[in-house]
Amino acid sequence: MSRYQSHSFDDGEINPFANPTSVPAATSKLSPLPPEPYDRGATMDIPLDSGKDLKAKEKELREKEAELKRREQEIKRKEDAIAQAGIVIEEKNWPPFFPLIHHDISNEIPIHLQRIQYVAFTSMLGLVVCLLWNIVAVTTAWIKGEGPTIWFLAIIYFISGVPGAYVMWYRPLYRAMRTDSALKFGWFFFTYLFHIAFCVFAAVAPPIIFKGKSLTGILPAIDVLSGNILVGIFYFIGFGFFCLESLVSIWVIQQVYMYFRGSGKAAEMKQEATRRAMMAAL
């Protein structure tokens, strides 16, 4: 074996200093890309209409802003005129979760009358509770075999009694307290007496006008107690509700009447009634 072995690079026939054209193709380099032409005086096309569009938009925004200010001033002027005329815009705000009526005692009722108004509102809610519990008790009696007629009557009492009480006596009292109107006070006294009479009648519930057991009075409670203790207990609870409602309502009408007489509204109402009668006669 020879001392030196031949190597693949030991090729004497390849001369690196030889003519480059004779170098094999594998060792040749790629030619670079030609440079891009440079034009120092080249210009960019900038749209000249963009400045005009901005000015037009600014002008449009200014016009809209001026229009909004003009409308705000017009609305404020109308509100001031309405306030000077004594007209109150009643926005529905109660109950908060589903507004049905306008009710804002703390901001619209004079502070010395707010206590009476709050108690009157309590009597309004008390009537709702009384008639609602009346439905529950009568439904229990119907299930125990008293018949469906009393249940339908209890539903009628609730459907007609709750909105009727609000329209007939609570809203007139609210407006009378707010505006200090003698005629509205007179209407409240007239309708609220019917409310008190109904509550007292319902607490007794004699079977003379309404179907006896359609109201949870003391007489139906004693009657049904002998047949079913549970129904009797429900009726006695309803009797207690109507008694409490009657007492609160009597207190309210006493307080309103004391204010009405003490403020001179009674004489004012007589004068107003006389004046209207004379105008009607003429």
From Swiss-Prot:
The modification Phosphoserine is found at S31. InterPro entries: SCAMP. The chain crosses the membrane at residues 118-138, 150-170, 185-205, 233-253. It is a multi-pass membrane protein. The keyword Membrane applies. It is found in: Cell membrane; Cytoplasmic vesicle, Secretory vesicle membrane. Residues 48-93 form a coiled coil. GO terms for cellular component: plasma membrane; transport vesicle membrane. Keywords: Cell membrane, Coiled coil, Cytoplasmic vesicle, Membrane, Phosphoprotein, Transmembrane, Transmembrane helix, Transport. It holds the Pfam family SCAMP. GO terms for biological process: protein transport. Probably involved in membrane trafficking. This is Secretory carrier-associated membrane protein 1. It comes from Arabidopsis thaliana.
